[in-house]
C-alpha cells in the first residue's frame, strides 16, 4: 500500500479540481499527499488553500508555441524530469498520479525511472499528449469518458468534489420552483470566457423583462468589471463573480447552465444533475471540448452550440423557449444525473494505493 502519493496536475481547473477530489479521498484514508504543478497556474492558489504541499516545476507547454520552443523541448523535458525526480525522492511518495497536461509528463517519467507506481487519469473525451505518451508505462489508466482509445484504460468518470456528488436529486432540488423565475448559471470555465460573457448579457437583455431569469455568473477575474458594467448598462440584475468558490451551492441553485465544455465542468453538471447549453472553446487542443459537449447532447442532457457564428439573437430565442419549460429542465437534469460516475475519486485513490476498489 502506498504510504504517500504525489499528484501531478496544474494549469487550469479542468486538471486541478478532479485532482483535488482524489487528493481529498486519499487524505481521508490517512495517505500523505504532495502536489507537483506549475509556478503560474491556478494550483498556486487552490492547492495550498486545500492544505496540500505544492512543488513547482520549471516547465511550459508546447502546443501552439513557436519552433524554437519545440527545438528546445528535449532539453527542457530532461531538466524537468530531473527536478521531478528530486521532488519525488524528497517527499517519499511511492506512487504518482498524473492528471494530464504538460506537468504530468516529467512527473510520470520520473515515477517510471525510479520504479514508483504510476497511475493516470484522462479527463477529456480526446486524450491529451502527455497521457497518450505515458499510458504504456502506467500501472493503471482511468478515463472520464468512454472509448478514448488509451491502452489499458478503465472508464470511471471524472472525480468530483464530495459536496457536488452528494447534492440531492434534481426532482428534489427543483420542487417548489414552479412560478418562480428560472435560475440561470453562467460559467466560462475556471478563468472565464469573454465571448460567453458578452453573448449572455446581450441575449438576456433582449428577453422581455417578465421572462428574464435570475442569474449567477462566473466571468473570470480579468472580466469582472466589464461584465458587471455590461449588466448594469443593459438594466439586467445579476450576481456576477470572478470565480465561484462554492460550486456545489451554485449547481444546487441552478435550473439550467450555459458554460464551456471542459471535462471537469461536464463531470460536475452530471454529478449534480443539471441540464446545459454548452459552448465549447473552439481552440481547445484536438477540439476536445466539442467531444465532451457531444457526449452531453447525445445522452439528452443538453445542447451543444458552436461558438462560430453564434449570435445573441439565437441565444435569446433558445432561452425564451427553455427558461419557462420546467419539464424540459428536469428531463435534461435527470439525463445528466444518469451519466454521473460518483465513485471515480475512490477508484483512482485505491489504484494509487495499489489496491483494487471494492
Predicted regions and their residues:
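Donor-nucleotide binding loops and adjacent catalytic segments primarily
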Residues: 41, 46, 50, 169-257, ...
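A short, well-ordered alpha-helix in the C-terminal region of glycosyltransferases
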Residues: 328-342
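Conserved nucleotide-sugar phosphate-binding/catalytic loop shared by glycosyltransferases and other
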Residues: 4-9, 29-79, 221-223, 308
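Glycosyltransferases and closely related glycan-assembly transferases
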Residues: 83-97, 103-119, 132-137
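C-terminal alpha-helical cap of glycosyltransferases
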Residues: 341-358
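Active-site-proximal region of nucleotide-activated glycan assembly enzymes
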Residues: 32, 42, 53, 112-170
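Acidic donor-binding loop of glycosyltransferase active sites
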Residues: 93-94, 252-266, 274-275
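Short amphipathic alpha-helix
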Residues: 15-26
